[in-house]
Amino acid sequence: MVSAVSRQLVNRQLNRVLLRNARIAPFARATRFYSSKYAQESENAKRHKMGLLIAGVAVAGAIVFVTPPQWKKYFRAAKKVEEVAESKEDPVSEAAEEVSESVQESTEEPQQSQEKETADVGNEQAQDESASSGDSEAKKAHDEFADQNEASEKESAPMGESADADQTAKDETVAEKTGNSKSESSESDQSEQDILSSDLEETMETVSEADKELHQISDNTVLSSEEDKTPKAEELKSTSPSGNDEEPKKEDDSSKTIHSLNSEKDMEAVEEEVKQESAYNPDTGEINWDCPCLGGMAHGPCGEEFKAAFSCFVYSEAEPKGIDCVEKFQHMQDCFRRYPEHYAEQLADPADDENVDHEKNLSEGKDTGVDSTPPKDEAYLKTEKEKKIEENASPDEDTASKKD
């Protein structure tokens, strides 16, 4: 029973709550709808007001800044017309003002004429007085000016003497300074000329040394090629028996012709080798920078400076030869001094180089003061006799060839 009653009570309370909610729900919805509607209307109104404000500002700006000058003039003229119309609204008052002005002018004219006459008389008197006073003042000023001139002349006499003395002293000092500057400039010029002359002498010495080295290299190559070939011929002749003098003349003639042909071929080969080994080819006018006679200086760190100096010396047409290449040789020497590890031989003293070359030539038998020929033993004397016999027999061979 208790549970049933409690259930009924609970159900009643739930029904009441549901009824209340059902009654309140439409009002809540309506309030929500109306509140949202009013909010939207207020926002639309704000937007509308802002749009009107922006449009007004734009129109005002267009009127002020964008309107053409003719319209502005028109507006100004309209304003002036309005102002004139406002000022001329009372014609009666204007007529009264004009009449009063004419009366005043008529009354003021005789007064003005009298005032002018009195003013003219006063002006004439004042002019007379001012003229008399001006003459007296001019006389006084003239007298004062004359007195001042006399005083200034008296004072300027001793001052002029002192000024002349000062000027003469200044002139003397200026002359001394100019003389000192000229002497200093002349001394500096002489020192520069001495330095340049010494540099020219050094460069000329280097040029001559380079030329000598080139000639020595070419001579050494020729001598070495000849020495390489002459020992072979001497060995062949030395191996021949001692009874060569008793051989018939035909064998001598044939050996002579063979020897002459070989000598001509040897000379041609030597000339070709010299041409190949020389750096400058006069036929083509080109310089072989890969020539071993240059010692690889054209490809070192100072290769460009060496090429410039060497080509200038080769193609130089000045007298003496290479005088116009002094600066380039100086640049080359400066570059050599910067790289002593690569150009130690070129930077050594020329006297030491000459001594070294002399010792080498002595060791190889190439010195000019020592004969490079082997000692004159019996075999060598025999070969000389054979050469004499061949030379004596050469005219007979020429005649025989002509007859054939």
From Swiss-Prot:
Placement of sequence motif Cx9C motif 2:
325-335
GO molecular-function annotation terms? protein-disulfide reductase activity
List the biased-composition ranges (Polar residues): 124-135
Signal peptide as annotated in the record? none
| UniProt keyword list | Disulfide bond, Membrane, Mitochondrion, Mitochondrion inner membrane, Oxidoreductase, Protein transport, Redox-active center, Signal-anchor, Transit peptide, Translocation, Transmembrane, Transmembrane helix, Transport
| Stored InterPro entries | CHCH (IPR010625), CHCHD4 (IPR039289)
Mitochondrial matrix compartment ranges equal 35-50
> Which Pfam families does the protein's record reference?
CHCH
PANTHER family per record: COILED-COIL-HELIX-COILED-COIL-HELIX DOMAIN CONTAINING 4
Q: What is this protein called?
A: Mitochondrial intermembrane space import and assembly protein 40
Can you name the source organism? Candida glabrata (strain ATCC 2001 / BCRC 20586 / JCM 3761 / NBRC 0622 / NRRL Y-65 / CBS 138)
Top-level taxonomy? Eukaryota, Fungi, Dikarya, Ascomycota, Saccharomycotina
Gene this chain is encoded by: MIA40
